[in-house]
Amino acid sequence: MVVDIDELDNLSAYLQSFTHRVKAVIVNKVKKNTDINMIRSKVNELGLFLIGYLYFDTDFHIESRHLGLYEPQKDIFNIVNKVSDELSKTLNFTMLKDFSVEEPHDTDIATEALNIKQKKYRLAFAYDEAFSFTYEENIKVLEEYGFEIVKFSPIHDKKLPDNIDVLWLSGGYPELYARELSSNTSMLESIYNADIPIIAECGGFIYLHKSFENNEGESFKGVGLIAGKAFKTKKLVRFGYIEIEAGSDSILMKRNQRIRSHEFHYYDSTCNGDYAHAIKANKSKEWDCINAHDNIFAGFPHLYLRGYEFLLQNLISFLEREKDV
């Protein structure tokens, strides 16, 4: 666990509530004149290990960014390199490795994935400047379940890849590339006429709308499979960790199945969907979400497949039924 340390006296009180699920601590923003052994003593008193620390340095500061999320760029790499150099002196990498052992995946799930892997499906996966927010673990799980990943660019390519069975539109910044996406009319038409299962998360969902706004509030033509408009607001909309329950069967979920997810966006839609019901982790808010009809599953929630492999089992069952028709 990484902990910012503003005042040494507050460290023990803060860590106290995490001792049942945290084994080791890395302390961040340490003042240069602080006694590291004193920090180590306070951490050890709680039965935890101090495996590293990072001194406060203005060179490590990262400016605020749209959504708080960063795509690869030169200045970020420079900061990362500086932090890496410092951590090479202050972080016990052996202890970090020892405390970071990954829990083995469920054997039954792994066996089932191997059995399914014999059935190959080609999945077009959007990945470019506008669509770059995805869990790499999702790619791994998709491949385990027999999907051949074919990456493509909604900005630069003229149409979808050939002979694909599924389309996955990941999250990203379509609003920052609205003009480029909208002007690529051949791609819009290719997606609209694809007639294959389409999964769209957040940014991908925005792109599927009949129209969507850019960051300046200008409206642009979208794919048109979601009959509404995605528009910018002045604050975060329905953000946080949530649990989603399906209201009926769809290409990814069956009625009453549940998954955990999250939403994090400044955009809203005139067509958010009511296929599923979402409840925040702290039970403070709840709302309807996701458009799921025919062969579409699209909404603001981000999907994480590891642990929810039944989503792919449902998708494969749908593909098999379509093949038999």
Task: Name these PLM-found stretches.
Residues 26, 168-170, 298-300:
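Structural motif
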Residues 174-250:
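Cysteine-nucleophile active-site neighborhood
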Residues 29, 127-129, 229, 303-304:
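Residue-level signal for short, function-critical loop segments
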Residues 1-3:
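Inter-motif core of Ras-like GTPase G domains
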Residues 119-183, 187-193:
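Phosphate-binding active sites in nucleotide-utilizing proteins
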Residues 5-113:
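Internal gly/pro-rich beta-alpha loop/helix module
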Residues 13-16, 40-44, 138-147, 315-316:
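Short, solvent-exposed amphipathic alpha-helical segments in soluble enzyme
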Residues 90, 118, 131-141, 232, ...:
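C-terminal and late-domain segments of enzyme folds
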